[in-house]
């Protein structure tokens, strides 16, 4: 049986989409730090979370909603999981797939949080959830060490626009 190129392309895209949507990259802090230091006019909304953190899980839909609302704008939602790297295939990827998260998800592979937390924000105690919103071009920056509602998240982002 011979399939046409458009049919093959369509089937390939359908099969590849779920795998792409669930891609979770494992990174170290220096790599994350470089990404956060880029001199762009994009506003970044970076949420530090974990699958075992109930308030984190509850607010993830708010970040997805924010991502969708700001599609096409210079706003980037980045979800940074603090689960253990050993849990990537057992917990994190299945969790991301089950929740239908489409924002970029990174798993931060750093065994000692005390070595990097102050580099994200000196006022951060290390508690989750933690959200950092910043724009390097305008030098605006704000942080939240608590769960954010959709309304609070939208209002926080509006201060950057």
For the regions a language model picked out, list residue spans one by one.
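Bacterial N-terminal signal peptides
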Residues: 10-16
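Sec/Tat signal peptide C-region and signal peptidase I cleavage site
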Residues: 17-21
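A short beta-strand-turn-helix
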Residues: 23-43, 67
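Short, internal strand/loop/helix patches
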Residues: 95-128
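Thiol-/selenol-based redox modules, centered on thioredoxin-like
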Residues: 130-161
């Amino acid at each position: 049986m011979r399939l046409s190129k458009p049919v093959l392309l369509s089937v390939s895209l359908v099969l590849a989409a779920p795998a792409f949507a669930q891609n979770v990259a494992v990174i170290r802090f220096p790599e994350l730090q470089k990404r956060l230091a880029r001199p762009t006019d994009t506003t970044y909304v970076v949420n530090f979370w974990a699958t075992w953190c109930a308030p984190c899980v509850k607010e993830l839909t708010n970040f997805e909603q924010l991502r969708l609302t700001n599609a096409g704008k210079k706003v980037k939602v980045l979800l940074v999981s603090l689960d253990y790297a050993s849990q990537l295939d057992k917990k994190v990827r299945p969790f991301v797939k089950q929740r239908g998260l489409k924002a970029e998800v990174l798993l931060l592979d750093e065994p000692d949080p005390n070595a990097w937390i102050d580099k994200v924000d000196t006022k951060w105690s290390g508690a989750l959830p933690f959200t950092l919103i910043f724009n390097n071009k305008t030098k605006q920056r704000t942080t939240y060490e608590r769960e954010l509602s959709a309304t609070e998240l939208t209002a926080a982002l509006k201060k950057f626009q």
